[in-house]
């Protein structure tokens, strides 16, 4: 599940087997979620659209299907940098 169309049920099964929750987030263009920190690891995967993740001052634009781990306690920001609505999966370690 590294590129192309995202099989959400398969991702959810995989994440749950690894101890993570799995939810779907929807962001309009230009939405910014700035400077968050969580007490647990978080996984993020773009379903469609274009987001930029900034984790501890390192920026990246993951492709749809690319999994990104945000370590517990890491400061992070999510931006919808595309011109359309972005959908992305997120999960927290349980």
What residue ranges belong to the model's regions?
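Short acidic-glycine-tyrosine-enriched beta hairpin
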Residues: 57-72
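Short histidine-centered beta-strand/loop micro-motifs
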Residues: 12-14, 32-38, 79-81
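Conserved short histidine dyad/triad with adjacent acidic residue
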Residues: 8, 21-38
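Ligand-binding loop in jelly-roll beta-barrel domains
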Residues: 72-94
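Short, conserved beta-strand element in jelly-roll/cupin
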Residues: 27, 37-53
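Structural motif
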Residues: 43, 50-52, 59, 75, ...
